[in-house]
Amino acid sequence: MTETMLPDPGPEQLPDLPEHEVVVCAVGREYFALPLESLAEIFKVSEITKLPLAPSYLVGVINVHGNLASVLSLGRILGLEDAGQEGLLLILTPDHGGIALHVDTTTGFTSYTVLEDVARDTSAKGNFVEIIEGVFRDDGKLISLINPEKLRVWIDSEFTKGDG
């Protein structure tokens, strides 16, 4: 019996996938990312004007270059620890509805090529699945990608619940 050696195919060629640039932030022990193109600025938390009778996740409003932005606690939206009085505000671009997300910190910028799906857990506290596009790994951390459009739709639906 003669044994034939097949040629080594070499490293498997994967298709060139586009890289997506994101800013990574943390709330408690969880990591999240926002597409870089959806981010206008990052501010240290400063004076936030509180709104009476607002839902708990709506921390208040701030003036961003003469425009009002709603400050939303990412931790409260997702049912996680609240960032408290400290932290950073991630100001989304105006086409995302004048939103400033309150987070604990940012850890930097990175990119990803492939997202993993998020399993739906209907018993989970918070609104994790509604605004998360998927997850990816970076430096051993599991990072959940926030879809700004899904966030805006979720906010709109929350505000219209009381309109009967």
Predicted regions and their residues:
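An acidic, low-aromatic, low-complexity terminal/linker signal
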Residues: M1-G164
